[in-house]
A protein has these predicted regions:
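Active-site catalytic microenvironments for nucleophilic, acid-base chemistry
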Residues: 29, 36, 76, 81, ...
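C-terminal lid/capping helical subdomain adjacent to the catalytic/cofactor pocket in oxidative enzymes
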Residues: 212-217, 223-295
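Mid-domain catalytic core of redox enzymes
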Residues: 15, 41-186, 190-201, 236, ...
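A structural signal for the hydrophobic beta-strands that form the central parallel beta-sheet
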Residues: 37-39, 75, 245
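A short coil-to-beta-strand element that immediately follows conserved catalytic motifs
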Residues: 38, 106, 203-215, 278-279
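Active-site/ligand-binding neighborhood in enzyme catalytic cores
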Residues: 1-46, 69
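Conserved beta-strand segments of alpha/beta enzyme cores
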Residues: 36, 67, 207-210, 242
Length: 295
């Protein structure tokens, strides 16, 4: 059939309480089967020996350190951080490729508003007849805003008073440490509201009833700098027989959530069948089509 960009399709499957619900459910099932999830800690070291990963060194928020041994290691951490966590046995050229991988960072400002001035001019029925889009790309060069999410349309269960209020997410693309990233939350929210007023999406700052800001580091793996040499890095990492790299940051690929999860599905399939090749894992969504196309 004719291919339609995901940005234009009218229906898709989405968790009732958002993507986090999926991971909360997975975590609960892991623990129910006897698995342990170590929270509030970060990986500070990756131990390797004879072509295998042997253990992870971790540090908790309270400064506690421990080593966690394992037979199989599935990594979704940024490739840059994964290689940086390995010891001095990593060749200098491989380490340089990993260190040079670029990213774009991301700030989202959530605003609860009384209403939007955007009208529903379609035949699509929505609660309270609000504009039906889940996301809107902003082309106005006079604002920094890049995209607007309308959470009411993702799932009405995300909004407490869905019949009279609208939760929107304003997305800004930036770099960690730049002037926008370093804005106080108060100034960031004020800027976001001012841009909406300037665009005519809301009428006045008093229309904003509540707000919340989130910063996301390394949200977008970028395809420049040392990315042109990433095949050398992939080949090196594939040399560790019990290490699998999955996900957007784990593969340094700008994939949608479904493709990112598919890399993990392929990994599990390989582990269960004894397949040693990583080709199917790295080849998810590499047909070079635009990443938001769907048959």
């Amino acid at each position: 059939g004719r291919k339609v960009e995901t940005s234009l399709i009218e229906e898709f499957i989405y968790p009732k309480y958002g993507p986090g619900q999926l991971w909360e459910t997975a975590a609960a099932e892991i623990e129910a089967m006897g698995g342990q999830i170590v929270k509030n800690c970060k990986v500070t070291g990756v131990r390797t020996e004879n072509g295998k990963v042997t253990a992870l060194e971790t540090e908790g928020t309270n400064g506690s350190k421990q080593a966690i041994e394992g037979d199989i290691f599935i990594s979704s951490m940024p490739l840059k951080d994964l290689v940086a966590s390995m010891d001095e046995t990593v060749p200098k050229d491989i380490r340089a490729i990993a260190e040079g991988l670029p990213y774009r960072d991301f700030v989202t400002v959530g605003l609860l508003v009384d209403h939007l001035n955007l009208k529903n001019l379609t035949k699509i029925r929505t609660l309270n007849n609000i504009v039906p889009d889940c996301w809107i790309y902003v082309q106005d060069t006079g604002v920094k805003l890049g995209r607007i999410q309308i959470f009411n349309n993702w799932s009405p269960y995300l909004v407490e008073d869905v019949d009279s209020k609208v939760w929107i997410g304003l997305e800004y693309f930036c770099n960690e440490g730049d002037s926008f990233w370093n804005l106080s939350e108060e100034k960031c929210v004020r800027l976001a509201a001012e841009e909406l007023i300037r665009m005519g999406v809301i009428n006045r700052k008093e229309d904003v009833l509540d707000s919340h800001r989130e910063k996301v580091k390394k949200a977008y793996p970028a395809y420049f700098d040392t990315y042109s040499q990433i095949d050398q890095l992939i080949s090196y990492l594939n040399g560790f027989e019990n290490l699998y790299c999955v996900g957007r940051n784990g593969q340094h690929r700008y994939n949608n959530m479904d493709h990112s999860m598919a890399t993990a599905f392929e990994t599990v399939k390989n582990i269960l069948t004894g397949e040693k090749s990583r080709e199917n894992i790295w080849n998810v969504n590499t047909e070079k089509e635009y990443h938001e196309e769907k048959a």
